Curated annotation (Swiss-Prot):
Reported cofactor(s): Mg(2+)
EC number: 2.7.1.134, 2.7.1.159
Residues annotated for ATP binding in this entry: 134, 184, 195, 216, 219, 242, 321-322, 324
Coiled-coil residues: none
Binding sites annotated in the UniProt record for 1D-myo-inositol 6-phosphate: 57, 99, 190, 195, 227, 229, 305, 324, 328, 331
Organism from which the protein derives: Glycine max
Gene symbol of the encoding locus: ITPK3
Taxonomic lineage of the native organism: Eukaryota, Viridiplantae, Streptophyta, Embryophyta, Tracheophyta
Pfam families assigned: Ins134_P3_kin, Ins134_P3_kin_N
Name of the protein in question: Inositol-tetrakisphosphate 1-kinase 3
Molecular function in Gene Ontology: ATP binding; inositol-1,3,4-trisphosphate 5-kinase activity; inositol-1,3,4-trisphosphate 6-kinase activity; inositol-3,4,5,6-tetrakisphosphate 1-kinase activity; inositol-3,4,6-trisphosphate 1-kinase activity; magnesium ion binding
Residues involved in Mg(2+) 2 binding: 322, 324
Gene3D superfamilies reported for this sequence: ATP-grasp fold, B domain
Keywords tagged on the record: ATP-binding, Kinase, Magnesium, Metal-binding, Nucleotide-binding, Transferase
Region (Catalytic specificity elements (CSE)): 250-276
Functional description taken from the UniProt entry: Kinase that can phosphorylate various inositol polyphosphate such as Ins(3,4,5,6)P4, Ins(3,4,6)P3 and Ins(1,3,4)P3. May participate in an inositol lipid-independent pathway of InsP6 synthesis.
Length: 354
């Protein structure tokens, strides 16, 4: 049930009018200065208003009923951003959550950030754009050169091919890359095509690939990868089945290019599978925390995930093979609690500064 009426604002003498909305027996009072929520507590709670601009597909996978219900109980209100109205005319928002593409939208967000510095934008458009090009995506990991007592984290050797497929075999030879090679589209825009992979077993077949693309040396990893979800300071790791290992015999016998769909997301979870313990063991928590903290700073992002593999036959040699902004959190266990806690911490931190 929804009610609208004018009431006096008890939180701030400056306020005169506010909108009262009753949803599922939870009273939400909204105005420009003092949004509050009263869910039967002795004192009202301040509402954290999250404006969201997401694709239809993302809304369906992310804004699930359980998330919205939990958010409402915690005093978080999700509000859809109207793309037909100026963003500055909407809100007020405490947080803007987005995953849309296009230069026009990026400019809208940049202008909004400049005119509304009090609003947390998740995440800065320029920082997100950095991950859309696989030529630069993994550079932050390579620059870290992370190595400590818990393990070593690197990236596979790779080569960027922007044009001229016929020249690929020669370029691969000059770069000294070792077969087999994984071919990925250069642009990582979240489309189905951007997640397609090809595995090339011999040099001659390389000229059948379609630039622009990135070639990465394939690292045997027991057919399992680790998806490391990062939400602010929180980290959650799940196992996924991946491409199977390639033996020397297979490399000598197989030819051509094998194409795969989106491997890690299409595959079933490997968490409950009967796996070799040396393959299934999760990366050390301290190593992941160090990696995530450093990447949050280097990338300027708070919502992303890493695809990590362990080199087969080793216990502590890891490779980051992909980074995705605002991934499919709906596949992350307990994402509703983790995400709402994160949004709440951002909102509370904002009000404490006032």
């Amino acid at each position: 049930m929804r009610l609208r009426e004018e009431v006096a604002c008890k939180n701030d003498d400056v306020c005169e009018k506010e909108e009262v909305v009753i949803e599922n027996d939870v009273t939400v009072a909204q105005n420009h200065w003092c949004p509050v929520v009263n869910a039967g507590f002795s004192s009202p709670k301040r509402v954290v208003v999250v404006g969201y601009a997401l694709t239809t597909k993302k809304i369906k996978s992310f804004l699930q009923p359980k998330l919205e219900g939990l958010a409402r109980n915690k005093g978080i209100l999700f509000v859809a951003i109207d793309h037909n109205r100026p963003l500055s005319d909407q809100g007020p928002f405490d947080i803007v959550l987005h995953k849309l593409s296009g230069k026009e939208w990026r400019q809208v967000l940049e202008d909004y950030r400049l005119s509304h510095p009090e609003v947390t934008v998740l995440d800065p458009p320029d920082a997100i754009q950095h991950l859309r090009n696989r030529q630069y995506m993994l550079q932050a990991v390579a620059d870290m050169n992370l190595s400590d007592s818990y393990g070593i984290v690197g990236v596979p050797r790779q080569l960027v091919i922007k044009r001229d497929a016929l020249a690929i075999p020669e370029l691969v030879n000059k770069a000294g890359l070792t077969l087999p090679l994984v071919a990925k589209p250069l642009v990582a825009d979240g489309s189905a095509k951007s997640h397609e992979l090809s595995l090339a077993y011999e040099h001659f077949s390389l000229q059948n690939l379609e630039p622009p693309l990135v070639l990465q040396e394939f690292v045997n990893h027991g057919g399992v990868l680790f998806k490391v979800y990062i939400v602010g300071d929180a980290i959650k790791v799940v196992r996924r089945f991946s491409l199977p290992d390639v033996s020397k015999w297979e490399l000598s016998k197989d030819a051509g290019i094998y194409r795969f769909p989106r491997v890690s997301c299409a595959a079933a979870s490997a968490d409950d599978a009967d796996l070799d313990p040396t393959v299934a063991e999760l990366p050390p928590r301290p190593l992941l925390e160090k990696l995530a903290k450093e990447l949050r700073w280097r990338l300027g992002l708070r919502l992303f995930n890493l695809d990590i593999i362990r080199e087969y036959g080793t216990r502590n040699h890891f490779y980051v093979i992909d980074i995705n902004y605002f991934p499919g959190y709906g596949k992350m266990p307990e994402y509703e609690h983790i995400f709402t806690d994160f949004l709440l911490s951002l909102g509370q931190g904002k009000y404490k500064k006032k």
